[in-house]
Amino acid sequence: MSDAALASIAPRHRRRGQLRADLRVLRGLAAAAIDPDRPLMAHLIVTRRCNLACGYCTEFDATSPPVPLAALKARIDRLAELGTVFVTLTGGEPLLHPDLIEVIRHVRARGLTPAMNTNGYLLTRERIRALDAAGLYALQLSLDNLTPNAISKKSHKPLRGKLRLLAEHAGFRVRVNTVFGAAPPAEALAVARAVSALGFDAKCSLARDPSGAPLPLDAEARAVFAQIAALDRRGTSIFSEDFQEELLERGRVDWRCRAGARFFTVCEDGLVHLCTPKMGLGAKPLADYGRDDLRRAFATPKPCAPTCPVAYAHQGSRLDAWRAQPLPSSLPPPTRVPGRVHLAVVR
């Protein structure tokens, strides 16, 4: 069956269970909109180990053991106590965790909305069905180029079969993200078109320098980026990423970042960090992270915000664009080296 024919069938299959899930999400978002103390999304690292070694990634290693199931369940319980809406399981490669399905079940059982990031290599028909049965709401698959190169191994050629399996069997939402700059611009456009042909949301994120700011694009890359932005299915995504066009045009975006409050990252050691690109900022045990921490982070401007290209940061802050940030910025610097994260615990 061709990709186009598969896409004509798959959306009907995916919609069957999505309406109820979408309604649950909308109820959670509505509750969070009136309660600024509630986190919208937490990125929960389940393992640092990854089966790939992409040149731009500093969030993995090849040796770390998975976070124990009991520890993950305790962290999920704490996120539920805080009223978190989304929990995104990430790594490393989450599919390397032997108890991933049970982790997803626990997220769902606690009334939270489970999502996950993956490079897709370990997906099988059986795993996709198991993820669906466990209650997974959304999956983001990284796909950067047509064929593997020195920068990224997340490529359409080896993953095309995995995409077709997702189109045929996934009842959860699927979004495919391309890091713009991991391959020639024409390849990014070809990937986006191939993904859209299968009925998935095709998104493109800007590559970042070590400080977290976006790398500049030349005229050719800007033109291709605009073509990807104009793909019809970009308008169907749950969260818009239109801030990227403004960032490319003006070099900055004026917004109020709610890192550490509306969204944050929980590392393998159970510490809360403002966000993944700024690991080390605000590192504090999740078990001790409470309303005062959320409120302080909510009210604190972030000096890196104007040039931030991180989509979930902007998305997680949109509910509160009108709410003030009266505190001065007083963030400690991040401490990290490629491939490993060095943490300073704040109590």
Spans of model-derived segments:
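Short cysteine clusters
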Residues: 50, 54-57, 257, 275, ...
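Conserved alpha-helical substructure of the radical SAM core
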Residues: 2-138, 329-330, 335-340, 347
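Short, intrinsically disordered, charge-biased short linear motifs at domain edges
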Residues: 40-45, 240-246, 286-299
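Secreted/processed peptides and extracellular or luminal domains of membrane proteins
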Residues: 56, 60-63, 263, 281, ...
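Processing junctions and N-termini across compartments
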Residues: 44, 48-51, 251, 298, ...
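Flexible mid-to-C-terminal extensions adjoining Fe-S/redox cofactors in radical SAM and related proteins
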Residues: 269-347
